[in-house]
A protein has these predicted regions:
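Catalytic core of DAGKc-family lipid kinases
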Residues: 5, 36, 75-207
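Short N-terminal binding/cap micro-motifs at the start of the first secondary-structure element
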Residues: 13-17, 150, 219-221
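Short, well-ordered alpha-helical microsegments
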Residues: 42, 66-67, 219-221, 292
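Conserved Motif II region of HX4D acyltransferases
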Residues: 64-65, 211, 287
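Glycine-rich phosphate/pyrophosphate-binding beta-alpha loops
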Residues: 144, 148, 212-226, 289
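ATP/nucleoside-binding phosphotransfer catalytic cores, i.e., glycine-rich phosphate-binding loops
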Residues: 198-205, 222-320
Length: 320
């Protein structure tokens, strides 16, 4: 029987609201769970789970929990990972074909105990590898500055609690920030000074209202705001200080329809291998805010195998 290791973040959105999922794993055959209640618990919990030599390591939490586990793992050997979408937005889980109803993903995870590993639906993804000015390396899937930070701040202040969790709430926060930019309301219209170099080529030095970089195929609500055609795993999109026609171009931006997003109007998107940024303001990776100032270097980490608990789909293999 395959052994399943589960790292559960008791503070993640759905887990914090209802502890039933965490409790449901107790006493199950070939299931080993460690529960964390703060960031300092994670290294010990991860070591305890890996010592079990599991067939799969499931992350029961949200985007920030996945980011924390990937960062803690670094480049060390690890079993295939799976994600139980127990956070508030669960953007990472959706992109890794682990999104949807939590009860169904739980059943799919537990079913792996009796299924040959070669039949599991899996996909291979390269997380972001972000090196901080002090030498620390973070792992995740999504980096953002500018209106991305403003949107997350607004979401935390106004929408996070009660019925405000989920992808739709994140979308509402993004629309609120876009409206604030159109109305030129502070702080939503505050641009960032962000000197950047992509694969040795300096980006335009003008202030940017938005900057994002990701190795994901889709963001929350299925958004794909990338249209660069260069080679490279790192997709980067940014907007000028005053992008022209943002209101009517917003649907095209969220779906990456290049013909409606000319650079002359302040819309840019490129792909590459290595991105260097000089930051003086807060930035986020997978929804977690950081205030480190200085030079950040972003690239793609080695590919990691994930089990697609929602079943096979584009980019997944197995379970035929």
């Amino acid at each position: 029987m395959n052994r399943i290791a589960i790292l559960s973040n008791a503070g993640s959105g759905r887990n914090a609201r209802k502890a039933a999922l965490i409790e449901s794993f107790g006493g199950l055959t070939a299931v080993y769970q460690e529960v964390t209640r703060s960031a300092v618990d994670l290294p010990r919990a991860l070591e305890a789970l890996l010592a079990r030599n599991p067939s799969v390591l499931a992350i029961n939490g949200g985007d920030g929990t996945v980011h924390a586990v990937l960062t803690a793992l670094g480049d060390r050997p690890a079993p295939p990972l799976a994600v139980l979408p127990a956070g508030s937005t669960n953007m990472t889980a959706h992109d890794l074909r682990c999104g949807g109803r939590l009860s169904r993903r739980r059943r799919a995870l537990l079913a792996l105990r009796d299924l040959p590993a070669e039949t599991w639906p899996t996909l291979s993804r390269s997380p972001l590898a972000l090196r901080c000015p002090d030498g620390r390396e973070l792992r995740g899937f999504f980096f953002g500055m500018g209106m991305i930070v403003r949107g997350i701040e607004y979401w935390h202040a106004s929408l996070r609690h009660g019925g405000g969790a989920g992808e739709w709430a994140a979308g509402a926060a993004l629309l609120r920030v876009a409206l604030g930019m159109l109305r030129r309301e502070a702080p939503f219209d505050t641009p960032v000074q962000l000197p950047a170099v992509l694969d040795g080529d300096p980006l335009p030095p003008a202030p940017k209202s938005l900057f994002l970089a990701s190795t994901m195929q889709r963001l929350f609500l299925g958004m794909t705001p990338f249209w660069g055609r260069e080679a490279g795993p790192l997709a980067c999109t940014w907007l000028s200080d005053r992008p022209q026609g943002l209101g009517w171009r917003l649907p095209a931006l969220l779906s990456g329809r290049a013909r409606f997003l000319p650079a002359t109007a302040g819309f840019f998107s490129r792909r590459g291998e290595t991105l260097s940024l000089t930051v003086e303001e807060p930035w986020v990776i997978d929804g977690e805010a950081y205030t480190d100032e200085g030079t950040l270097t972003l690239g793609a980490a080695p590919p990691q195998t994930f089990v697609a608990l929602a079943g096979p789909g584009p980019g997944a293999k197995g379970a035929k």
